[in-house]
Amino acid sequence: MAKENQLIIQLRGFDAKHYTRTERYAKQVAKLYQTAADEFASLAGKINLPAGGTFNFDDFPKAKKQARGIVTRLAGKIEAVVTSGQRSEWLAACQKNDAFLASILRTSKLTKEEAERYQARNLEALSAFQKRKENGLNLSQRVWKYAEELKDAMELGIDVGLGEGKSAQQLSRDLRQYLNEPDRLYRRVRDKGGNLRLSKAAKMYHPGQGVYRSSAKNAQRLTRTEINMAY
């Protein structure tokens, strides 16, 4: 009985460490979004918007190209965090499995070959898991979707900020705030007016059931979900 309790405590310890690491990965993604918001603010500081004008990336080819670069880098780094976390936690799960097997091998009649088979890391299965699709989208496509949503939100935020004469520093602060509090942005866009902008904001404001209005929060949830599934 004492050995069983000791095993339970040991296995729970593996789980606790896993959840701590998973939150660390999610925080890495949050920092990537903050960096991207700062890059969008820096980009906006070089734009000369006519008085009363509306900002749209399509009207500023150079800014649009820079925005595409920001989104591409963001998506690549998020995917790297997720896949690295998946591999790390997959192997952590193997260690947990090893601990469990070690506790029963003392009294089992498994051969050495059978025990080794149970303890295999099966990285081929991990690779297949990482390449799977959900709703027709692979991991890269799902990550890209959220990164693209950030660009749309930043476009609205830049439009509002430039219209209010915000400095690059002020805009950077606002854009960072919008990452976790998108409602602030949608209210300001609504107050500013403009049917086109309201239409785009409304679409982002009602993303669908089970989906955050915040691209950053959606990406963090994706990170947690993918890594937890690998574990």
Language model features with spans:
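N-terminal leader/targeting and assembly helices and adjacent pre-domain segments
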Residues: 1-209
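Acidic, glycine-rich two-metal-ion catalytic cores of nucleic acid-processing enzymes
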Residues: 203-231
